[in-house]
Amino acid sequence: MNKKVYFAGSIRGGQNDTKLYHDIISYINQTDFVLTEHVGDVHRSIQEQSRDKDSLIYEQDTAWLRECDVVIAECTHPSLGVGYELAYAEKYQKPTYIFYRNKDTMLSAMLKGNPYFHIYSYENKEDLFQQIDIILERNA
């Protein structure tokens, strides 16, 4: 309990799943702490930022990745940023769990073929939450 969780999801490409991201983050926050709550902000702007702003985002996100206890990523929507975050997490040996809806995407072979990552397909939120309970060692 009280794990620091880095939640990753496609911000610029996954707008249709912002509500899902919000629900996942809220669920995790019941017992643990999500460092990246902004990913589930249903009111966030996805406009392109300045290079300076993007540099600040990079510095903050990589600091959070180094600080976290575990990475949970929703990868239904392909994202260069999430892919980078996953590689960074692997570099720092953070336990990393990838979720995706099999009916909505074909997950990259670069992720599926990497034995480092724990990968789960899911059908609905309840399936996803059950896996999160196991990952976070909750008494389900």
Q: Which residues fall in each region the model found?
A:
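Conserved catalytic or regulatory cores that recognize and/or transform ribose-phosphate-containing ligands
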Residues: M1-A140
